[in-house]
UniProtKB/Swiss-Prot annotation:
It comes from the Bacteria. Binds 1 [4Fe-4S] cluster per dimer. This is Nitrogenase iron protein. SUPFAM superfamilies: P-loop containing nucleoside triphosphate hydrolases (SSF52540). Homodimer. GO terms for biological process: nitrogen fixation. One of its GO terms (molecular function) is ATP binding. It is an enzyme of class 1 (oxidoreductase). Its EC number is 1.18.6.1. ATP binds at G10, K11, G12, G13, I14, G15, K16, S17. It comes from Klebsiella pneumoniae. Gene3D superfamilies: P-loop containing nucleotide triphosphate hydrolases (3.40.50.300). [4Fe-4S] cluster binds at C98, C133. It catalyses: N2 + 8 reduced [2Fe-2S]-[ferredoxin] + 16 ATP + 16 H2O = H2 + 8 oxidized [2Fe-2S]-[ferredoxin] + 2 NH4(+) + 16 ADP + 16 phosphate + 6 H(+).
């Protein structure tokens, strides 16, 4: 099997890291050889796989020893549940420098040190929020990741983010092989959520690859710094992540997306009752003016 490099994007706080780690645990359980590269200064992309608060990052360790060139691969790569290989890029202190630069440095280091040569089936990049700036777009800009999955929900801002990320994919698809593999709906239990994300996926020219229902067992596992797959392998939610993993293994629908205009996106949100039609007669009017009308 040729190594597949996948990047997981989505709005901040949508559950990307949790979804990615449970998905990866399911792939490992299936016998796949997987590496996770955390591309977020928070360094929380591997904690459930490693049972750790936060893995030491490549940028932190480079600062301690002097430079990235002074590090060894075994310093930065840890092995977790199911023999999953874990690395965190990290970034500078808040307010200092460009965290995206840390992603670029980290991925280049892993490549140069041969981290990608060990018979891997999948590499997953867990990428910071909905920021598609140059640094955080590194996994797609440099043709590292060729499959993108966007974690979203039926909430308005999560859908805006999915649309914006799709615009970024279109930009880089012109010069490379990057494609959108689908939307993963990490449910927030909003009304008609699955129908809404299926409709959004159709507008983007892609698919909702899986609907992950909300379940408190995810939080119970997280408190123990474990994936659901490891914490309670027989539970219903573990099977949801296994289904997602199998769908990604079998996925052949990889497209250049067709992002919506703002008007199209707002029409979709209005159609599903998430957004009300704008009343232009009240724009710019003070409370006193409205009361006098």
């Amino acid at each position: 099997m040729t190594m597949r490099q996948c990047a997981i994007y989505g709005k901040g706080g949508i559950g990307k890291s949790t979804t990615t780690q449970n998905l990866v645990a399911a792939l490992a359980e299936m016998g796949k050889k997987v590496m996770i590269v955390g591309c977020d200064p928070k360094a929380d992309s591997t904690r459930l796989i490693l049972h750790a608060k936060a893995q030491n990052t490549i940028m932190e360790m480079a600062a301690e020893v002097g430079s990235v060139e002074d590090l060894e691969l075994e310093d930065v790569l840890q092995i977790g549940y199911g023999d999953v290989r874990c690395a965190e890029s990290g970034g500078p202190e808040p307010g200092v420098g460009c965290a995206g630069r840390g992603v670029i440095t980290a991925i280049n280091f892993l490549e140069e040190e041969g981290a990608y040569e060990d018979d891997l089936d999948f590499v997953f990049y867990d990428v910071l929020g909905d920021v598609v700036c140059g640094g955080f777009a590194m996994p797609i800009r440099e043709n590292k990741a060729q499959e993108i999955y966007i974690v979203c929900s039926g909430e308005m801002m999560a859908m805006y983010a999915a649309n914006n990320i799709s615009k970024g994919i279109v930009k880089y698809a012109k010069s490379g092989k990057v494609r959108l593999g689908g939307l993963i709906c990490n449910s927030r239990q909003t009304d008609r959520e699955d129908e809404l994300i299926i409709a959004l996926a159709e507008k983007l020219g892609t698919q909702m690859i899986h609907f992950v229902p909300r379940d408190n067992i995810v939080q119970r596992a997280e408190i123990r710094r474990m994936t659901v797959i490891e914490y309670d392998p027989a539970c219903k939610q573990a099977n949801e992540y296994r289904t997602l993993a199998q769908k990604i293994v079998n996925n052949t629908m990889k497209v250049v997306p067709t992002p919506c205009t703002m008007d199209e996106l707002e029409s979709l949100l209005m159609e599903f009752g998430i957004m009300e039609e704008e009343d232009t007669s009240i724009i710019g009017k003070t409370a006193a003016e409205e009361n006098a009308a």
